[in-house]
């Protein structure tokens, strides 16, 4: 699996040119991508990056990548991120690492979003992986009940015996809805709930997925079909 992540990372690095301003998401495949960019930076590649998580930022700095503040005016050339699940149409389920809100902000600030993954992340329908939902800690039990009224089973994410705390000082509910037949409708309903900050459904955001398999690298766009 680590070899596939390296393959996807190296393929994605070919998109990065000298002088670019890019977005960096989070997760193990993105971390490998950052390491590849760090190797290129040592060879003279000059780029600037906005990081979606503190872990990504720390790794990027350690690898010699110049981190900049979130852009206020101009768009980033491209953002790179991972995914927990990728369904046809490049519908994504993300947030296993707990950085979904910042990942979505960085993706929205870029001209295009490229997803890095191995073939295990390709699915026919989203939902085998529980849907992360970032929530306000105050009154979280009521928020969980509202989500469960929509048909899900919500579990508070823990770190040891304490709630997991996001970089935004919020909490995460991992919500089991089974197969998500209509991601657009579910995202809209959950996002409307009082106490919900953001969902891990990334819809109509990615323009391409770079997927590594034992047979090589596959470049998947929104209209492409793929075998799961």
Swiss-Prot record:
Tell me how this protein assembles. Answer: Homodimer.
User: CDD domains of this UniProt entry?
Assistant: RPI_A (cd01398)
Organism expressing this protein natively: Shouchella clausii (strain KSM-K16) (Alkalihalobacillus clausii)
Entry-linked NCBIfam families: PRK00702.1, rpiA
Reaction equations catalysed = aldehydo-D-ribose 5-phosphate = D-ribulose 5-phosphate
Q: Which HAMAP family match?
A: Rib_5P_isom_A
- The name on file for this protein is Ribose-5-phosphate isomerase A
Residue positions annotated to bind substrate are 26-29, 81-84, 94-97, 121
| Keyword annotations of the record | Isomerase
């Amino acid at each position: 699996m680590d070899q596939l992540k390296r393959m996807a990372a190296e393929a994605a690095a070919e998109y990065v040119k000298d002088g670019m301003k890019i977005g960096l998401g989070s997760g193990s495949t993105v971390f490998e991508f950052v390491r590849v960019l760090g190797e290129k930076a040592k060879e003279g590649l000059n780029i600037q990056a906005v990081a979606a998580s503190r872990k990504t930022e720390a790794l990027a700095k350690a690898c010699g990548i110049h981190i900049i503040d979130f852009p206020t005016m101009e768009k980033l050339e491209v953002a790179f991120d991972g995914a927990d699940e990728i369904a046809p149409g490049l519908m994504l389920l993300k947030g296993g690492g707990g950085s979904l809100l910042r990942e979505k902000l960085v993706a929205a600030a870029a001209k295009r979003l490229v997803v890095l993954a191995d073939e295990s992340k390709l699915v026919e329908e989203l939902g085998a992986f529980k849907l992360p939902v970032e929530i306000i800690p105050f009154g979280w039990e009521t928020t969980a009940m509202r989500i469960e009224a929509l048909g899900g089973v919500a579990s508070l994410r823990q770190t040891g015996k304490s709630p997991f705390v996001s970089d935004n000082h919020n909490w995460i509910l991992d919500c089991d809805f089974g197969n998500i037949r209509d991601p657009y409708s579910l995202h809209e309903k959950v996002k409307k709930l009082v106490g919900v900050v953001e969902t891990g459904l990334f819809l109509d955001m990615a323009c391409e997925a770079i997927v590594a398999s034992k047979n090589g690298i596959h470049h998947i766009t929104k209209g492409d079909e793929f075998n799961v």
